[in-house]
Structure formats: structure tokens, C-alpha cells
């Protein structure tokens, strides 16, 4: 059985439909690694992230959160408000992947500011990301793992940094040198290991809990 430093109590039936969305009422996490929640669309990944954020707020634990839909609107509104029309035009005319990568770059800046200011004296800090792979090519996801996740762990080794990602891209499940990645079945909380893309594809297409 896996041992985790932080164990969260999970609402198994968040929508009160009389049918459990999750098969576990506990979900464990470890700092110093990227936890990737895996499962097909509709399996509860975003709802699990909502559970996590609820726990963090109730325990006054500092965190930053990325949501693709919200970030896209926020970036455009911010650019217009600041009369940064070049950025606004870029966002409106760019592809989905280009827009997402632009948003993640801005999110990375906010994360760095939070770590060195708002959470400067905090031992524990969480980074929550939902649908950050939307429209991104493999090289951009690798860049996020290298330039954001890995850099954060190296920049503040004294902190317990938790990174939790909900994604559909296989590339997020692949560890890279110096960056441990653990995949977890969002419904059961159990660790899942994928040998290759075909293994991941088969697991998603035959998801027994869906």
C-alpha cells in the first residue's frame, strides 16, 4: 500500500445523485512530485480538483490554481483592461494551443510571485492545474514539465510543493529526468503505471469504472 504525506477526505457523492462518483473517501498526495489524475472525460477529474481546493481553503493552505476556460477569459479581459491590445489581438487570433501556452506562461509568473511573496514563509504550497494540455503539442507539454514543474522544485527545495494535474494527454504521464510523476486513477485513487501510449490508450478506452 502506498504511503502519502497528506491524506484528503473526499466527498464520494459531490452531486448528491445517490450514486458515488468516487470509489474512495480518501486520496493521498506526496510533495516533490507531479500527481497526474487520469481517467476519460466525465470521470471526475475536475470535481476531484474542486475537492482538493475546498480542503486547502478550509485549512488555510496556500495554493494557485489554473483552469483553462477561466484563464483564457481572464487573460483576454486583463489585456483589454490594461489597454494591451497587442496581447489581446494575439489571444484572439492565435490557435487554441498558442493561447493556452500564453496563459500558462502568465500563470507561471503568478506562481513564482506567490511562492516568493504570499507563501514566502509557508512550508507547504500546492499547484492545481486543470486542462492545461488542451490544444498543446507534445513539445509544449514537455516544456511545461521542464520549465515550470521541474524549475519550481529546484527553486524552492525547502518547501513541500504539491503539483496536481488533471489532463487527457499521455505526455503528462511520462516522467522526465529529475521530475517524478505519479499517475492516479481519479475514481479509485490507485496508482497506475503506463508502459507506453498504447498501454495508456487501452486503459482509457476500457475504463472499467466509467
Where are these regions (language model features)?
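N-terminal pre-Walker A segment at the start of P-loop NTPase domains
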Residues: 1-26
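Phosphate-binding P-loop
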Residues: 25-32, 119-122, 155-157
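ABC ATPase nucleotide-binding domain signature region
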Residues: 32-106, 187-190
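Residue-level preference for the first positions of well-ordered beta-strands
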Residues: 34-36, 124-126, 162-164
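Short, solvent-exposed loop/turn segments at secondary-structure junctions
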Residues: 42-43, 71, 133-135, 170-172
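C-terminal lobe/lid and adjacent interdomain/linker elements of RecA-like ASCE P-loop ATPase modules
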Residues: 67-87, 143-210
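Conserved alpha-helical scaffold flanking the Walker A/P-loop in AAA+ ATPase domains
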Residues: 101-120
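Conserved P-loop NTPase "ATPase switch" module shared by AAA+ and STAND
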Residues: 120-139
Amino acid at each position: 500500500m502506498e504511503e502519502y504525506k497528506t491524506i484528503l477526505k473526499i466527498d464520494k457523492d459531490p452531486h448528491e445523485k445517490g450514486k458515488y462518483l468516487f470509489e474512495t473517501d480518501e486520496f493521498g498526495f506526496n510533495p516533490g512530485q507531479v500527481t497526474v489524475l487520469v481517467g476519460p472525460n466525465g470521470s471526475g477529474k475536475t470535481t476531484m480538483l474542486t475537492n482538493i481546493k475546498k480542503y486547502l481553503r478550509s485549512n488555510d493552505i496556500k495554493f494557485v490554481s489554473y483552469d483553462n476556460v477561466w484563464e483564457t477569459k481572464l487573460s483576454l479581459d486583463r489585456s483589454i483592461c490594461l489597454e494591451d491590445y497587442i496581447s489581446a489581438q494575439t489571444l484572439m487570433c492565435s490557435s487554441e494551443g498558442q493561447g493556452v501556452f500564453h496563459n500558462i506562461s502568465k500563470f507561471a509568473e503568478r506562481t513564482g510571485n506567490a511562492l516568493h511573496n504570499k507563501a514566502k514563509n509557508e512550508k507547504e504550497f500546492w499547484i492545481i492545474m486543470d486542462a492545461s494540455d488542451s490544444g498543446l503539442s507534445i513539445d509544449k507539454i514537455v516544456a511545461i514539465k521542464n520549465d515550470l514543474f521541474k524549475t519550481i522544485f529546484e527553486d524552492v527545495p525547502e518547501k513541500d510543493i504539491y503539483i496536481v494535474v488533471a489532463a487527457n494527454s499521455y505526455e503528462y504521464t511520462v516522467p522526465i529526468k529529475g521530475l517524478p510523476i505519479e499517475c492516479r486513477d481519479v475514481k479509485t485513487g490507485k496508482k497506475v503505471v503506463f508502459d507506453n501510449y498504447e498501454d495508456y490508450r487501452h486503459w482509457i478506452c476500457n475504463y472499467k469504472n466509467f
